[in-house]
Amino acid sequence: MNDTYQPINCDDYDNLELACQHHLMLTLELKDGEKLQAKASDLVSRKNVEYLVVEAAGETRELRLDKITSFSHPEIGTVVVSES
């Protein structure tokens, strides 16, 4: 399996940035099939890999942006993440 980070589309990134600024509660679907509801907290970059920092069930998690299939919130609709 190729685990090289694939940057996501700029518009999708902008929507995640907006979600973090407003601490929106997102419904996320990950490429491994996991679904979760989590509050968007921050976007961070380490070693050229970008992560969405979320708070879910009292825990802080970092989700690799290229491992997110989609995210949704009533204010932004459903966004299916595409690679840039």
From Swiss-Prot:
SUPFAM superfamilies associated with the record: Rof/RNase P subunit-like
Disulfide-linked positions: none
InterPro entries reported for this sequence: ROF, Rof-like_sf, Rof/RNase_P-like
GO biological process: regulation of termination of DNA-templated transcription; transcription antitermination
A Pfam family matched in the record: ROF
Membrane-traversing stretches: none
The protein's role, per its UniProt record: Suppresses temperature-sensitive mutations in essential genes by modulating rho-dependent transcription termination.
Signal peptide coordinates: none
Protein name from the UniProt record: Protein rof
Gene of this entry: rof
Lineage: superkingdom: Bacteria
Origin species: Escherichia coli (strain K12)
